[in-house]
C-alpha cells in the first residue's frame, strides 16, 4: 500500500510543527521572521530566532502570532510558505495538508486563515482539525495505516 503525501501543520504562537506521514517525523521551528526595512524577508523559523536581539536597526525580528491569535496575516503566510517549502521540498503531486486550528476563532481570523491556507496549498486537499499535533498525528497514522 502506497502512503499518500500527507502533512499536518500546527500553527502555534511560539512554534510551528509540521508532521510528515511518510517519514513519520515532526519538524519544530520557531514562529519568527526577520525582515529588512519592513519589506524583505531575511530569515524564517529557527534561523530568525538565532538573529533575535542581534540584528542591526534596519532588520526587525518579529513573531507573527500573539496570544494564540494571528497578529500579521502576511507574515504568517510568509512563515508557513517558507517552512512548508523547507520541510517538504519533494512533496510530490497534490499532498494533503491538515491544519490544527483553534475552536474559538473570530470570523475575521477564520477568513484570514482560510485565505492564506488557500494561497499556500495551491488548491491541494485541505483539512482543518481542532486538536493539537500529537493527537492529530495519532489520528492520521492510525487512519492511513489501518
Where are these regions (language model features)?
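Nucleotide/phosphate-binding catalytic cleft detector across ATP-hydrolyzing
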Residues: 1-13, 17-29, 34-42, 46-146
Amino acid at each position: 500500500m502506497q502512503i499518500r503525501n500527507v502533512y499536518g501543520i500546527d500553527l502555534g504562537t511560539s512554534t510551528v510543527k509540521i508532521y510528515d506521514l511518510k517519514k513519520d517525523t515532526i519538524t519544530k521551528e520557531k514562529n519568527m521572521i526577520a525582515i529588512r526595512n519592513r519589506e524583505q524577508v531575511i530569515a524564517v523559523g529557527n534561523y530568525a530566532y538565532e538573529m533575535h536581539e542581534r540584528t542591526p536597526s534596519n532588520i526587525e525580528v518579529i513573531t507573527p502570532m500573539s496570544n494564540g491569535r494571528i497578529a500579521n496575516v502576511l507574515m504568517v503566510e510568509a512563515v508557513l510558505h517558507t517552512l512548508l517549502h523547507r520541510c517538504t521540498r519533494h512533496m510530490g503531486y497534490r499532498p494533503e495538508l491538515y491544519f490544527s486550528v483553534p475552536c474559538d476563532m473570530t470570523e475575521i481570523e477564520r477568513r484570514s486563515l482560510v485565505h492564506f491556507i488557500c494561497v499556500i496549498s495551491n488548491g491541494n486537499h485541505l483539512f482543518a482539525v481542532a486538536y493539537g499535533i500529537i493527537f492529530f498525528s495519532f489520528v492520521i497514522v492510525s487512519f492511513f495505516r489501518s
